[in-house]
Design a protein with these regions (language model features):
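Transmembrane helix-bundle signature of multi-pass membrane transporters/permeases
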Residues: 4, 86, 90, 116, ...
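Interfacial loop-to-helix junctions that mark the boundaries of transmembrane helices
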Residues: 5-10, 42-55, 80, 105-109, ...
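N-terminal signal-anchor transmembrane alpha helix
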Residues: 7-28
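Interfacial/capping segments of alpha-helical transmembrane domains
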Residues: 23-44, 159-173
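A cytosolic-side transmembrane-helix exit/cap motif
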Residues: 55, 102-105, 130-133, 157-167
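Transmembrane helix-bundle core of multi-pass membrane transporters
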Residues: 141, 145-214
Length: 215
């Protein structure tokens, strides 16, 4: 089997095996797997709104997967991506809430850059420790997930100003000028929350592919 064919076959076989195992488990517990999978796919792809919501949910997952792929290419196992993503999200949300009146383009560019920097810094810590002290990146990244989680929670509770908060533990919604949603994309997908984050993720896919394959 060629390498190219293997790259396509392995994920496909994994998905099919997962569905097969799921079907067996449903049969064991007395459920009909045919109707279960029918409902799954008809709900997911049965309307433009649902398709838009799927694409919206895919966007951060694509970016997180890209982060893993870069580390994996370097021979490292980065299991700290949830924490690194949370660091980026928290930083970007703080900026969006702190400067709600910025033009949309400026706000989006700034939040993307701030999220990249915050996630990059938290990802660099285990990398530096691995490079200079020989520590296991697996252990460090797992531990940092929890550190970042609690730090982010405290930033929301105590680091956000009163006008940024809806309650003691939740921020306000970001302004329309800072949102990645647009009226055009929302109307295109029947009112879903589909936004330009999906297109940013696709651009990131191309950039990472170019970096890994062409440089």
């Amino acid at each position: 089997m060629s390498k190219k064919l293997q790259n396509w076959a392995v994920p496909l076989i994994a998905v099919l095996l997962g569905m097969l195992i799921g079907a067996v488990l449903m049969l064991i517990f007395g459920y009909d797997p045919f109707w279960a999978y029918y409902d799954l796919f008809s709900t997911a792809f049965g309307s433009l709104k649902n398709i838009g919501e799927i694409l919206r949910a895919m966007s951060p997952l694509i970016l997180i997967a890209l982060g893993f792929s870069v580390a994996s290419k370097a021979g490292l196992f980065n299991i700290g991506l949830p924490g690194q993503a949370l660091a980026g999200w928290t930083s970007a949300v703080w900026f969006a809430l702190a400067f709600p009146e910025l033009p949309k383009v400026v706000s989006i560019v700034c939040t993307v850059i701030i999220g990249l920097v915050a996630g990059g810094i938290t990802g660099a810590v285990p990398g530096i420790l691995r490079a200079y002290l020989g520590t296991s990146e697996v252990i460090v990244t797992i531990m940092m997930n929890y550190i970042i989680l609690y730090v982010a929670n405290n930033i929301v509770r105590f680091g956000f100003t009163a006008d940024m908060l809806r309650s003691s533990e939740a921020s306000n919604r970001i302004s329309a000028s800072a949102s990645y949603q647009t009226d055009f994309l929302s109307s295109l997908t029947d009112g879903s929350r589909f936004n330009i984050g999906f297109f940013l993720a696709i651009v990131a896919v191309f950039l990472v592919w170019f970096m890994l394959k062409k440089t």
